[in-house]
């Protein structure tokens, strides 16, 4: 569940946030994710924000579904991609398709700890055989609210190990760290998990 104050922040700053992140360099990270996908596959952009990655995946020939918990972000993303974007949170999303890949870029970090681990138990069921989940999280931060009222959940090796322990049908295929592309003093963890059976 994404809390109300976090959603309210993105509703109030949707245009500004989307513009700030629209052209952030993500080519390398997206390329790693895409190499695990069937080119005819379907992607779920879970917490799609302003639709930056959703649009690029579409331009690369993929069919993409997107959702976000912020109604204003959904409006911006739909305008940017030309596609409908469903307004819902991680808990209430109901898939109509099976996915080759699930992309959760900088979105799960707004979950509670319980919601974060519940995501993997639930969303792996939306994957087809050998489907993958990509997610990115901030490392080296404490769980809590920032000065803008947004909730953040930090990430560490212990949390990754718990995901794998609770989900033996998910295999870690890649785990790497990257610098912040907005030039903040942050390090991001990037993880790709693959459904084994």
Question: Model segments located where?
Answer:
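Class I SAM-dependent methyltransferase SAM/SAH-binding core
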Residues: 50-92
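A short acidic, Gly/Pro-enriched loop at the edge of an enzyme's catalytic core
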Residues: 94-102
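A short glycine-rich, Lys/Arg-flanked "PGG" loop and its adjoining helix->strand segment in the class I
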Residues: 117-129
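Conserved beta-strand signature within the Rossmann-like core of class I S-adenosyl-L-methionine
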Residues: 130-137
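Acceptor-substrate binding/catalytic loop of class I
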Residues: 143-159, 182-184
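Conserved S-adenosyl-L-methionine
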Residues: 170-181
């Amino acid at each position: 569940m994404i809390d109300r104050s976090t959603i309210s922040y993105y509703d109030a700053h949707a245009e500004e946030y989307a513009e700030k992140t629209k052209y952030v360099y993500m080519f390398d990270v997206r390329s790693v994710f895409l190499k695990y996908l069937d080119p005819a596959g379907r992607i779920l952009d879970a917490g799609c924000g302003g639709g930056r990655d959703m649009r690029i995946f579409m331009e690369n020939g993929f069919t993409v579904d997107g959702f976000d918990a912020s109604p204003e972000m959904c409006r911006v993303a739909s305008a940017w991609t030309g596609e409908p974007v469903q307004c819902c949170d991680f808990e209430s999303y109901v898939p109509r398709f099976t996915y080759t890949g699930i992309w959760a870029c900088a979105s799960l970090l707004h979950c509670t700890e319980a919601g974060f681990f519940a995501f993997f138990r639930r969303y792996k069921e939306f994957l087809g055989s050998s489907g993958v989940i990509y997610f990115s999280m901030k490392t080296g931060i404490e769980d809590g609210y920032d000065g803008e009222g947004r909730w953040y959940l930090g990430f560490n090796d212990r949390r990754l190990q718990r995901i794998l322990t609770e989900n033996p049908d998910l295999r870690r295929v890649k785990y790497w760290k990257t610098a912040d592309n907005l030039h903040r003093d942050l390090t991001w963890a990037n993880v790709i998990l693959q459904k084994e059976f």
